[in-house]
């Protein structure tokens, strides 16, 4: 297809380690990889990072964290617990917040997914507040939450 340029994006979210992103460009020849640098995760509760609020804390082997990819999408990860349902767990900083309130569905692992687990509603507000709401159990997985930041 002469005269056409195609772009293909690959955004890889690795549960542990550093996220990666690649953009592949193809004109009239072969695909070319334009590697894009992606920031490291920001650990909730880490030095210079947002603090936990309302008794929320990390639990298990996947600490709460977030990052923004080169396309402006913010991704959360980790497992938190001990906070009261419907309270602010932490607040994302400016530049990592959604334009509109966003709502995500995850689960708590009180017994694991399936019969032992329960649905969790995670609201991320325009002021950066991250608010998990659940009916039973205390552990909340954040990995399903991602949105475009403004």
Where in this protein do the model-derived segments appear?
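Extracellular repetitive beta-rich solenoid segments
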Residues: 1-35
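Generic beta-strand structural signal
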Residues: 25-27, 67-69, 124-126
């Amino acid at each position: 297809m002469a005269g056409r340029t195609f772009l293909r994006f690959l955004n890889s979210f690795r549960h542990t380690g550093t996220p990666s992103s690649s953009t592949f460009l193809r004109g009239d020849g072969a695909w070319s990889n334009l590697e894009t640098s992606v920031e490291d995760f920001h650990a909730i509760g880490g030095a210079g990072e947002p603090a936990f609020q309302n008794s929320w804390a990390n639990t298990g082997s996947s600490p709460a964290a977030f990052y923004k990819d080169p396309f402006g999408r913010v991704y959360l990860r980790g497992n938190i617990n001990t906070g009261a349902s419907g309270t602010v767990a932490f607040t994302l900083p400016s530049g990592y917040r959604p334009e509109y309130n966003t709502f995500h569905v995850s689960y708590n692992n009180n017994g694991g997914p399936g019969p032992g687990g329960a649905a969790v509603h995670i609201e991320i507000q325009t002021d950066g507040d991250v608010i998990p709401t659940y009916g039973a159990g205390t552990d909340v997985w954040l990995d399903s939450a991602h949105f475009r930041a403004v």
